[in-house]
Amino acid sequence: WRALLARPTIRAAVLTTAAGHGLMILVMNATPLAMHGEGLNLQASGQVIQWHMLGMFLPAFVAGPLVDRWGCRLVACGGAALLIVSAIVALLGITHWHFMISSCLLGVGWNLMLVAGTTQLGHGHAPNERARAQGLMELSNGSVAAVMSFASGALIAQAGWAAVNIGLLPIVTLVVLVQIAQWDRRRQPAERSL
């Protein structure tokens, strides 16, 4: 995996998918806890989860064509921007509508980051490296998801709902900066031959 991670395209792809996946899990594990803490009922939590699921999977019909048209980096940055907007909406209020809109935007952002990052991964490796590259990405996503899942409850209990949303901002910013750096970088010799 060291040789794969030496390639900027692979690093950007793995960071994008792992960050999107981990942050989505962090926020969505904390969301029902925050809603309960604000006195919202189980039905409201169920509706928020429904809208989040729509946000996660409904864009599947357009995410691929968006990547084809605008490219992996721009779509990844668009997904990251939606995570930022999601956090801002969550920070603006604690009503049912704030939770629902924020969670839906979080789902759409996750979808765009996942599709863009996965496609970007495919541009960074040779066909004979496919299984190793996919394994690297899956291990990264799963590891980050596990950490964020455990961290979510502790973070909301110790620091609150606002901290969960503020905490995702530096990670999303890092994804955007890495993707922007890729725009100006000439293709690496190892990637040029792929």
Task: Indicate where each model-derived feature is located.
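Juxtamembrane intracellular "pre-TM" segments in multi-pass secondary transporters
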Residues: 1-13, 194
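Short amphipathic helix-loop junctions that connect adjacent transmembrane helices
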Residues: 29-48
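Helix-to-loop junctions at the C-terminal end of transmembrane segments
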Residues: 59-72, 156
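Structural signature of the two symmetry-related core transmembrane helices
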Residues: 74-88, 169
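Paired small-residue
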Residues: 86, 97-105
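Intracellular juxtamembrane helix-capping segments at the cytosolic ends
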Residues: 112-125
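A late C-terminal transmembrane helix in Major Facilitator Superfamily
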Residues: 129-158
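A membrane-interface helix-boundary motif in multi-pass transporters
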Residues: 154-172
